[in-house]
Amino acid sequence: MSTLMIGAATSEMALDAASLATGRMLEAPLRAGAFVIVHDQTPFCMISCDVIALTRDLVDEIGAGVAGTCGIPADNLLVTSTHTHHAPGTLPIYLNPRNEAFAQRTVAAAVDAARKAM
C-alpha cells in the first residue's frame, strides 16, 4: 500500500526600518511558504517567497539548505517568487544594489518553511 503525507507552513521574513521596497512601500508581512508532499518516502517540496525575483545563487542556497535540513534533494524542489513590489530587492535593479541582508533572510525563511512543513 502506498503512503502519502502532505504538509504546509510559512515563515516570515523579518524586516528592519532601513529596508526599502522595490518600487513601493512595504504593505504587509512578507513570507516564504512551503508545501511538502512525501509519496512512498520520496519527498517533494514547493516553496514560494514574497520577493520580486530570486537569482540562481539564492535558489541554490535554498536548495542546499532544504537538502541539509529536510533531506529533500534539489531535483525534488521547486522554488518561485510572488514577484511582489512590496519587498526589498533580492536582485540589483537600476542603481539599487541587492539587499544582501534581506536576501539571506529570504533564504533562511524558505528553509525554515520547508522544515516546518515536513
Regions inferred by a protein language model and the residue ranges of each:
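Conserved beta-alpha junction segments in alpha/beta enzyme cores
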Residues: 1-118
